[in-house]
Regions:
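Structured-RNA-binding interfaces characteristic of tRNA pseudouridine synthases
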Residues: 1-149
Length: 149
């Protein structure tokens, strides 16, 4: 068995989050599993380092998939990417030691939030930034963030 670590980027606007769901095909995990399963001609499970909600984007989410044998270099980044929708990409694929699991092996995660403080929403960043047309109270935000540790 071969375990691969996938680094994935996606624009989650059109999707119902990461986790596969019985009532929709519009999840990142579900689409990855469908495309990879079709490519290797047997069912696979893609495990994410965490779940995202509907509409959430990721620029470097880690996932893992176990295949019974090695695949050619470029299988994920060329072949699978060629079958994925334009808003989901496998940026990198690495062969890992058996036992690697994206969620269980995760040491840390980074969450980034974008706040647009302009008077009007930025036309190019409107899908990726929360529009708040005031200066935020940075000290209060720092204090609140301290409670998350």
């Amino acid at each position: 068995m071969r375990t691969y670590k996938l680094t994935i980027a996606y624009d989650g606007t059109r999707y119902q989050g990461w986790q596969r769901q019985a009532n929709t095909d519009r999840t990142i995990q579900g689409i990855l599993e469908k495309i990879i399963s079709e490519a290797v001609q047997y069912p696979v499970e893609v495990n994410g380092s965490g779940r995202t909600d509907a509409g959430v984007h990721a620029s470097g989410q880690t996932a893992s998939v176990v295949l019974p044998g090695a695949v050619e270099e470029g299988f994920f980044t060329d072949y699978v990417n060629g079958k994925l929708p334009h808003d989901i990409r496998i940026c990198k694929a690495n062969l890992m030691k058996n036992g690697f699991h994206a969620r269980k092996s995760a040491a840390w995660k980074i969450y980034e939030y974008c706040i647009d403080t302009g008077m009007k929403p930025d036309v190019f960043r409107r899908r990726y930034c929360y529009h708040f047309p005031c200066e935020p109270d940075l000290e209060a935000m720092r204090k609140a963030a301290g409670y998350l540790k």
